[in-house]
Amino acid sequence: MKVIATLYGLLFLTVVLGDITEGNENDLVENFREELSEADIPLLKKLEAIEDALLEKDFLPYEEEDRNARPKRCAKVRNWCAKNEDCCCPMKCIGAWYNQQSSCQSTFMGMFKKC
């Protein structure tokens, strides 16, 4: 029973202190607005416009990059290749989907190829 009473007491204090904190924040905002001069208002509007522009820029949809345009690298030999074939025998060099990396994929026909 004491545990339940203690929990109710903590819940009550949390609610009361939360309201007090919110009230203090509102008072601080009102005091800040009173301290602003007429000269500060255009500056604040400029700052808000800059902030809105930055937020809008951050959330613009990005164009998906063409993964075929990325350079391909032979992971086993560690050299860059322009073509998929003859990159790392008996492997085939394929481009990765991210970070411009690539990996070597084993091919059966590549085993009989001369490098």
Swiss-Prot record:
InterPro entries: Delta-hexatoxin. It holds the Pfam family Atracotoxin. The keyword Methyltransferase does not apply. GO terms for cellular component: extracellular region. Gene3D superfamilies: 4.10.40.10. Its main location: secreted. Expressed by the venom gland. It is found in: Secreted. Residues 1-18 form the signal peptide. Keywords: Cleavage on pair of basic residues, Disulfide bond, Ion channel impairing toxin, Knottin, Neurotoxin, Secreted, Signal, Toxin, Voltage-gated sodium channel impairing toxin. One of its GO terms (molecular function) is toxin activity. Belongs to the neurotoxin 06 (delta-actx) family. Neurotoxin that slows inactivation of voltage-gated sodium channels (Nav). In vivo, is lethal to both vertebrates and insects. The presence of a 'disulfide through disulfide knot' structurally defines this protein as a knottin. This is Delta-hexatoxin-Hi1a. It comes from Hadronyche infensa (Fraser island funnel-web spider).
